[in-house]
Design a protein with these regions (language model features):
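N-terminal leader segment of winged-helix/HTH proteins
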Residues: 1-30, 76-78, 88
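Short alpha-helical "packing" element that flanks the helix-turn-helix/winged-helix DNA-binding module
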Residues: 36-40
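Short capping segments at the starts of secondary-structure elements
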Residues: 46-51
């Protein structure tokens, strides 16, 4: 029988694995990882653009990872940006079109995987997930020692 730790870890890892497979399928033709799709969707909600630092904070990603991924998105013609870390990053027309596709597919995916839940179950699920996320964040800051 699985312990709660094993059950939790296994399920979270499996969800993450499948989500990345789904996201990667749409990004392969651009030679990009599925994880870069979050930057496109965040930027689509910021028509005036964001700095790499703001994008890092908004996506909960490491600044070095964001910088590397932005270079790839720029090479793919999906974003434009000025020089320097504080420069504004915006979507190109091609980036906007791809972001819209990603958002539509993500909405479909979330609807599909949560389609068997009632609205009450969905509300409870997200409430509990938010609390677990916050508790994990706090625990990672204070550590186990």
């Amino acid at each position: 029988m699985l312990s709660r730790f094993e059950h939790f870890t296994y399920d979270i890892n499996e969800i993450d694995l499948h989500w990345h497979r789904i996201a990667s399928a749409g990004m392969k033709r651009y030679g990009l990882r599925g994880g870069t799709s979050i930057y496109l969707t965040k930027l689509s909600a910021a028509p005036d653009g964001m700095s790499a630092s703001e994008l890092s904070a908004a996506c909960g990603r490491d600044k070095a990872d964001v910088s590397r991924d932005l270079r790839q998105l720029e090479r793919a013609g999906l974003i434009s940006r000025g020089k320097g870390y504080r420069a504004c990053v915006t979507l190109t027309e091609q980036g906007k079109a791809l972001a819209e596709q990603i958002i539509r597919k993500a909405e479909y995916a979330v609807g599909f995987v949560g389609g068997s839940l009632t609205e009450e179950e969905r509300e409870v699920f997200y409430s509990v997930l938010d609390r677990i996320t916050e508790n994990m964040r706090r625990l990672s800051e204070i550590g186990l020692d």
